[in-house]
C-alpha cells in the first residue's frame, strides 16, 4: 500500500471519527493541488476496493476491511495491500 493511501486510512484514527468528509481527507495531501487530486484518486480506489464506503454528501467511512488494512500503520496485523 502506498504512503498516501496509508495516510488517508490513518486519518480516521487521527481525527478520532468514524466518518470523514472529503475536505478532511484532503488534509492527507497537504496544501498542494496535485497532492489533493491524488487523495481524491486514492479515496475512489479505496471505495472500489471495499476499504471505504460512501455515506453521502462527500462523507466516507472505513469498512471492516479498511480498519484491518489501516491496522499495520497503527501497529496491528492488518493485510498488506
Label every model-predicted segment:
Residues 1-31:
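Short amphipathic alpha-helical interface segments
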Residues 3-6, 37, 41, 64, ...:
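Generic alpha-helical secondary structure signal
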Residues 21, 55-56, 79:
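A generic structural-conservation signal
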Residues 32-48:
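Short amphipathic alpha-helical interaction segments
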Residues 47-57:
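A short, conserved structural fragment
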Residues 58-64:
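Minor-groove-contacting beta-hairpin "wing" of winged helix-turn-helix DNA-binding domains
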Residues 67-81:
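Short, amphipathic alpha-helical interaction segments positioned at domain boundaries
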Amino acid at each position: 500500500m502506498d504512503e498516501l493511501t496509508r495516510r488517508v486510512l490513518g486519518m480516521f484514527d487521527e481525527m478520532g471519527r468514524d466518518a470523514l468528509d472529503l475536505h478532511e481527507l484532503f488534509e492527507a495531501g497537504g496544501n498542494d493541488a496535485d497532492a489533493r487530486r491524488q487523495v481524491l484518486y486514492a479515496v475512489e480506489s479505496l471505495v472500489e476496493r471495499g476499504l471505504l464506503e460512501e455515506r453521502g454528501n462527500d462523507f466516507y467511512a472505513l469498512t471492516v476491511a479498511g480498519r484491518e488494512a489501516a491496522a499495520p500503520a497503527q501497529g496491528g496485523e492488518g493485510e498488506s495491500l
